[in-house]
C-alpha cells in the first residue's frame, strides 16, 4: 500500500504473495506505472505516485477488452462486350464494418462504398497487337474489405506512409503492345489521390521479350507525389538480359532505386530518402527447372541520408552460387551460397565480409506418403539484437498467433 493505494511491486521471493500481473501501455500521464527494466526476461514495472492528482506514468495493470466486431461485404459484378475488340467490366462493393457490436456509438460511419470499372480496346491487329486499357477505382473512406485490396508493396510504391486519409481515387491507363510468341511492351500511367492529403502519379514501363537466344526483361517506374507535409520523387528500374546457347547461358543485371522525399516546411530530406545501384554478371549451365549451376558477381553502391545530404555510405561486392544438384521424382538437392564484402566509406569502419549459405534436401517415400526436408544453413556477420512487442487484435485481423 502506498498512501492507501494498492500497488504492485516486482518480487522474486518465494515467501511473498505473488500475482501474475499484465500491464498495458496507455497514453502519457494516463497511467501510474513506468517501464523500469526491459532487459530482464520478465519486464519490470515501477509505481510512480501522481503529482497534484496527475498520473506520471504510461502503463496500467489492466487488460483491454476486445469488443466483438462484424464485417460484411456485398459485391455486384457485370460484364459487357459491345464488339469483339472491346471489353468492359465493373464491380460494385458495399461494406458494413461495426467495430463494437455492444455499442451504437459512431455507427454512422459503418457503411462504405467501392466501385471499379475496367475497359480494354484493341487498336491494331497485325504483326503487332496494340491494346489500350483503363482501370478506375473509387474507395470511400469508410469502406472496409475482408482481405487486402493491393499488394503489400503498394504503400512503398507510392510513398504513402501511414498518413493517407479520405476517399481514394485510383486511375490506371496505358498501352500494351504484344508481338505474338516474342514478347510484349507495356506503358502505364497511374494517378492516385486521397481526398484528405495525398496526390501522386506514376509512369511505368515494362518489357519482356524472347528473341531467338535472347531473353530481355525490364521493369521501371517513376513516381511524383505531393502530400500535405512532403513531396517525393521515386525512380526504380530492374533490367536483365540473358543469352542462351545450348545448355549454357550468360547474362547481366541492373537494379537501381532513387527515392527522394522532402519536407515542405524545411525543404530537407526525410529519413525515407535513399539511393542504391547494383550491376553484375552471371553465367550458368543446365536446365533452370531441373539440374543446373549458376555463378554470379554483383557490385552495389548504397547512398543514405548523412547530415541532411544523400551521400555514399558503403560499397559491396557479392559472389553468388545458385544450383540444383539433384532433381528426381523422389528427391532434390539445392545449394545456395553468397559471399559479400562490405566496404564502408567511413575510414574508421572496417570492411565486413560475410558468408551465407543454404542447402535444402527433400526426399519422398512410399509414393509421397512420407516426405522429409533437411535444411542446413550457415551465417556470418552480426545481426543487431531486436525486441518485438505484439498487441492482441480481434480474431482474423492479425498475422501471428499465440503459441506456448
Describe the role of every protein-language-model region:
Residues 1-404:
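Surface-exposed, low-hydrophobicity segments enriched in Gly/Pro/acidic/Ser residues
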Amino acid at each position: 500500500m502506498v498512501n492507501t493505494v494498492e500497488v504492485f511491486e516486482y518480487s522474486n521471493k518465494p515467501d511473498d504473495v505473488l500475482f501474475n500481473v499484465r500491464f498495458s501501455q496507455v497514453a502519457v500521464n494516463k497511467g501510474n506505472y513506468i517501464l523500469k527494466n526491459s532487459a530482464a526476461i520478465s519486464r519490470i514495472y515501477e509505481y510512480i505516485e501522481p503529482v497534484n492528482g496527475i498520473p506520471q506514468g504510461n502503463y496500467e495493470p489492466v487488460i483491454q477488452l476486445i469488443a466483438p466486431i462484424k464485417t460484411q461485404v456485398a459485391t455486384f459484378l457485370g460484364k459487357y462486350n459491345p464488339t469483339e475488340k472491346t471489353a468492359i467490366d465493373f464491380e460494385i462493393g458495399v461494406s458494413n464494418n461495426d467495430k463494437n457490436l455492444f455499442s451504437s456509438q459512431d455507427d454512422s460511419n459503418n457503411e462504405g462504398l467501392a466501385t471499379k470499372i475496367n475497359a480494354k480496346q484493341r487498336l491494331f491487329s497485325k504483326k503487332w497487337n496494340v491494346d489500350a486499357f483503363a482501370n478506375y477505382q473509387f474507395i470511400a473512406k469508410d469502406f472496409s474489405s475482408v482481405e487486402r485490396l493491393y499488394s503489400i508493396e503498394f504503400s512503398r510504391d507510392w510513398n504513402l506512409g501511414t498518413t493517407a486519409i479520405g476517399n481514394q481515387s485510383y486511375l490506371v491507363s496505358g498501352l500494351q503492345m504484344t508481338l505474338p510468341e516474342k514478347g510484349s511492351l507495356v506503358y502505364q500511367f497511374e494517378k492516385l489521390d486521397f481526398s484528405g492529403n495525398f496526390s501522386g502519379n506514376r509512369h511505368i514501363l515494362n518489357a519482356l521479350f524472347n528473341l531467338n537466344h535472347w531473353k530481355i526483361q525490364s521493369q521501371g517506374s517513376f513516381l511524383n507525389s505531393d502530400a500535405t507535409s512532403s513531396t517525393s520523387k521515386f525512380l526504380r528500374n530492374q533490367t536483365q538480359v540473358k543469352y542462351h546457347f545450348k545448355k549454357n547461358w550468360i547474362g547481366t543485371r541492373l537494379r537501381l532505386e532513387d527515392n527522394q522525399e522532402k519536407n515542405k516546411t524545411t525543404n530537407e530530406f526525410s529519413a525515407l530518402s535513399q539511393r542504391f545501384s547494383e550491376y553484375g554478371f552471371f553465367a550458368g549451365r543446365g536446365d533452370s527447372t531441373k539440374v543446373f549451376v549458376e555463378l554470379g558477381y554483383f557490385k552495389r553502391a548504397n547512398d543514405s541520408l548523412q547530415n541532411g545530404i544523400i551521400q555514399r555510405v558503403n560499397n559491396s561486392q557479392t559472389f553468388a552460387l545458385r544450383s540444383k544438384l539433384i532433381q528426381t521424382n523422389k528427391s532434390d538437392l539445392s545449394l545456395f551460397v553468397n559471399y559479400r564484402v562490405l566496404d564502408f566509406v567511413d575510414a574508421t569502419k572496417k570492411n565486413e565480409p560475410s558468408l551465407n549459405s543454404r542447402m535444402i534436401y527433400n526426399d519422398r517415400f512410399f509414393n509421397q506418403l512420407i516426405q522429409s526436408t533437411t535444411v542446413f544453413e550457415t551465417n556470418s556477420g552480426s545481426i543487431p539484437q531486436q525486441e518485438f512487442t505484439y498487441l492482441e487484435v480481434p480474431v482474423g485481423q492479425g498475422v501471428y498467433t499465440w503459441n506456448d
